C-alpha cells in the first residue's frame, strides 16, 4: 500500500487470526522508505475530554486508535483526527464495550490510513532492528508498569544499546522516561483477546 508516496508500517502486539500471524503473540510493524530516526508526533488520550469511543471515552479506552494516530502523523507529517479514528474503530468492530479495543485495531486502522503492517512477534532483536531503521513499533502491554489490564503504546526509538523511548498515549510522565527494551518485551501482552 502507498501512503503519500511513502509506505508506512506500524507495529503492534498481535495474536491469533491477524495479518498472517501465528497463534503466538506478535508485534505488527509499519515501514518507511528511508532509514532514519522517526520524528514523533505525540497524541494523548486525555486531550479529548468527553469524546466517546463506543460506550466509553477516548481517555479511558482509546489507546489503540490514539497509538495508530501517533504512527500515522509521525510517518506522514499529517495531523490525525483521533476522535474520528476512534469512531472508525467502533464502526469496524475493533472496540468491545467494557474491554476496550482489540488487537485488530492496529492493522485495521493502519490499512484504512494506507499503512502496511508486518508482524514481528515478541522477538527483541526484530523490534530493535525495526526501531533502529526508524519504524514505529506499537506494542499491546499487559499488567506491569504501563497498565493493570491492557494498553497500547508506541515504541519510537532505541537509546544506546538496550533502552527504548516510548510514546505512551495515556501518560506524558511515562513518555518522558527511557525504558529497558527487555522489560517492555516481557510486559507485552500475548493472545488474541489482548486489549
Sequence positions of predicted segments:
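Conserved active-site-adjacent core of cysteine acyl-enzyme catalytic domains
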Residues: 35, 72-195
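A broadly tuned, weak detector of single residues within folded domains
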Residues: 12-13, 56, 148
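Bacterial N-terminal signal peptides that target proteins for export
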Residues: 2-14
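Active-site-adjacent structural segments surrounding the nucleophilic cysteine of cysteine proteases
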Residues: 6-9, 24-95
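N-terminal leader/targeting segments
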Residues: 3, 21-22, 30, 160
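Hydrophobic core
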Residues: 15-23
Amino acid at each position: 500500500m502507498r501512503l503519500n508516496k511513502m509506505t508506512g508500517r506500524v507495529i503492534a502486539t498481535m495474536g491469533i487470526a491477524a495479518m498472517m500471524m501465528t497463534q503466538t503473540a506478535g508485534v505488527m510493524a509499519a515501514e518507511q522508505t528511508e532509514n532514519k530516526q522517526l520524528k514523533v508526533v505525540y497524541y494523548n488520550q486525555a486531550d479529548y475530554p468527553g469524546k466517546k469511543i463506543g460506550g466509553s471515552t477516548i481517555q479511558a479506552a482509546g489507546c489503540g486508535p490514539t497509538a495508530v494516530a501517533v504512527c500515522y502523523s509521525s510517518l506522514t507529517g499529517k495531523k490525525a483526527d483521533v476522535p474520528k479514528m476512534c469512531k472508525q474503530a467502533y464502526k469496524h468492530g475493533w472496540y468491545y464495550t467494557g474491554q476496550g479495543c482489540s488487537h485488530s485495531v492496529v492493522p485495521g486502522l493502519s490499512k484504512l490510513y494506507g499503512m502496511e503492517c508486518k508482524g514481528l512477534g515478541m522477538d527483541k532483536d526484530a523490534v530493535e532492528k525495526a526501531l533502529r531503521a526508524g519504524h514505529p513499533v506499537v506494542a499491546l502491554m499487559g499488567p506491569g508498569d504501563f497498565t493493570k489490564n491492557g494498553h497500547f503504546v508506541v515504541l519510537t526509538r532505541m537509546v544506546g544499546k538496550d533502552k527504548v523511548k516510548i510514546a505512551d498515549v495515556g501518560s506524558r510522565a511515562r513518555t518522558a522516561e527511557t525504558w529497558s527494551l527487555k522489560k517492555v518485551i516481557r510486559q507485552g501482552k500475548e493472545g488474541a483477546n489482548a486489549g
